[in-house]
């Protein structure tokens, strides 16, 4: 029998091959990456970490483990910014991993003042 192929579908999510081929990333973390990528492209909705945690059938511990793995492997950046005396957090899902800090602290002007590797 000839090798089979998947039928193409409409309404699909495009994911960089980098993470799918990264042998250092667990399937759990790859799955979370894919889910996040699929949802953040939806218009008219701001997604939070908690929104994605609620989608995790495996529970908080498994979600936290995959989230941590994405941060530590460089696929997920956390930006913590001062906003009129309050802290605001934004998450950035990267197509390719970046070395260095995964959590960046910004002042009111948007300048990075410290990170998870070097606190000011």
What residue ranges belong to the model's regions?
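N-terminal leader segment of winged-helix/HTH proteins
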Residues: 1-10
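Short, intrinsically disordered low-complexity segments
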Residues: 6, 85-87, 96, 118
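Short amphipathic alpha-helical segments and their helix-coil junctions
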Residues: 10-19
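Winged helix-turn-helix DNA-binding recognition segment
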Residues: 18-30, 36-91
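Charged low-complexity intrinsically disordered patches
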Residues: 93-120
